[in-house]
Amino acid sequence: STNRNNLIEIRSWTEIQEKKLNLTEDEEMFRVAVIQLHLEYWKKYENVLKEIKICDPACGSGAFLNQCFDYLHEEMNFVLEMKHLYAEGQLNLFDIDKQILQNNLFGVDINPESVEITKLSLWLKTAKKNQTLASLDDNIKCGNSIVADSNVAGEYAFNWKEEFPQVFANGGFDIIV
């Protein structure tokens, strides 16, 4: 948070200094190039955040997934603020909650009730008036995250590659909590 405030203070200080000076054309081109570099950085970081895959293989009530959600949500909001700050344009808002729930967070638990509690806890965190809740059926699943053999685990046998094909098509999970 302190680093974020420092970035904003640096930006404000830079603007004040630029007003004091009568920038030459070369200096203005340099300033624009620096702003473009900052924008490029924030866009790349945004893409990293959008693509990261986090899994809790024993999600229980969803406590760890909720913490991961909070972290990603805070980071995405900050990235959008920084992009807006450097672009000096309109803030580009999209549904961060839905993005995180459907693309970033995944969980498995052997207890069906725990799976439903995890979904409920994430829905309670992200529910908005007059908006449909994000579907979590493809991301939060019931199964034995250790045993894939149905002869051993019965109906709870869990094959990761079959259950999360889109994740494993791109190399698997980035973070396991």
What function would you assign to each model-found segment?
Residues 1-177:
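SAM-dependent methyltransferase catalytic region
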